[in-house]
Amino acid sequence: MGQKCNPIGLRLKIINTWDSLWYANKDYTTKLHEDFLLRKFIKKAFYHAAISKVVIARKVDLIMVNVYSAKPGVIIGKKGADIDKVKQQIVKMINNNIELNIIEVKKPELKAVLIAENIAQQLEKRISFRRAMKRSVQNCLKIGAKGIKVSCAGRLGGAEIARTEWYKEGSVPLHTFRANIDYGFSEAKTIYGIIGVKVWVYLGETKSSNE
């Protein structure tokens, strides 16, 4: 089971929590779709800001959006000009008041999503997939990860037949629920087609939130 499903979803309410912090009796699908559009828009608007996650909380007349980024300066811009512009665009899109908070990610080398995006960007620049995977794995372990596993799938190196290549170092116990495992996925759009990049990072054992 642990090998097949998303490690973050599997550990919800054990050591992880949701990225959408709200409850709704009605209009649930509308609000869920709004969350999806918000995340998509923010990711697209700040593609180079290394965004690891977007947490959305709702009140009656306010939507609070916390953006976790390794490069907060890219989002804020000069004197906050960029962030104000994005706020106005979001208000137009969802027709509601919004509070946008930017939170800096201290160790981006340990965030699986950012590692996957970094590898995907290297593949798009035609860097060897083995070199890209190995470099990211070494950087992650150097910062303090207990283990990391990386998978690249597609027409690697322009090969005629698609295949999957793995690179793993250290321990990644996917079946252990108390194991704090971060998971990330990204796609590299190359001239040969799309290459999928998956990353699992083991950060050590954590006490469950129920204890």
Curated annotation (Swiss-Prot):
One Gene Ontology CC term in the entry: cytosolic small ribosomal subunit
Record-linked PROSITE patterns: KH_TYPE_2, RIBOSOMAL_S3
Lineage top rank: taxon: Bacteria
Pfam families in alphabetical order: KH_2, Ribosomal_S3_C
Gene Ontology biological process terms, A to Z: translation
Keywords (A to Z) from UniProt: Ribonucleoprotein, Ribosomal protein, RNA-binding, rRNA-binding
Record field: transmembrane: none
GO molecular function terms noted in the UniProt entry: mRNA binding; rRNA binding; structural constituent of ribosome
Residue ranges annotated for the KH type-2 domain, each copy included: 38-106
CDD domains documented for this protein: KH-II_30S_S3 (cd02412)
Family statement drawn from the similarity comment of this UniProt entry: Belongs to the universal ribosomal protein uS3 family.
Assembly and binders: Part of the 30S ribosomal subunit. Forms a tight complex with proteins S10 and S14.
Function field: Binds the lower part of the 30S subunit head. Binds mRNA in the 70S ribosome, positioning it for translation.
Protein name: Small ribosomal subunit protein uS3
Species of the source: Ehrlichia canis (strain Jake)
Gene name as annotated: rpsC
